[in-house]
């Protein structure tokens, strides 16, 4: 049974990855326009310094990216109040996930190491799943009110 389920998952992986890539890029573009965001780091965006390299190396751009909120308080408020975005879970699921890397995945890094790799306490890592983008946008906006 497990092998059968894995086979089914693999057979639709390309379609799911393309859908996730498209949604992630749209969400990142929307985030770039928001006044509560300082910077969005997504390799599919024209603003990314290594966009050409990413397009050359990857057939599908992953749905995981980072955004720096204008303040730590705003980033934390979003994480605490979001209803749709799941927190502290592994990325790559069908559901959208978020984390503050300086507190979770990179918590063992020093402030200097975090700064060197472009992560601040207001950086939020997003993994966009298959939810409706309108719902995700509304969830974020409602969470930071």
Predicted regions and their residues:
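Gly/Ser/Thr-rich helix-start
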Residues: 10, 93, 130
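Conserved hydrophobic/aromatic beta-strand scaffold that supports enzyme active sites
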Residues: 5, 64-66, 97, 125-127
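Structural motif of enzymes handling amino- and sulfur-group chemistry
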Residues: 1-65, 71, 75, 81
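Mobile, glycine-enriched helix-loop/loop "lid" segments at the mouths of ligand-binding/catalytic clefts
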Residues: 88-102
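PLP-dependent enzyme catalytic core of the Aspartate aminotransferase-like
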Residues: 73, 80, 98-145
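A generic structural signal for well-ordered coil/turn residues at beta-strand boundaries
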Residues: 61-63, 92-94, 120-122
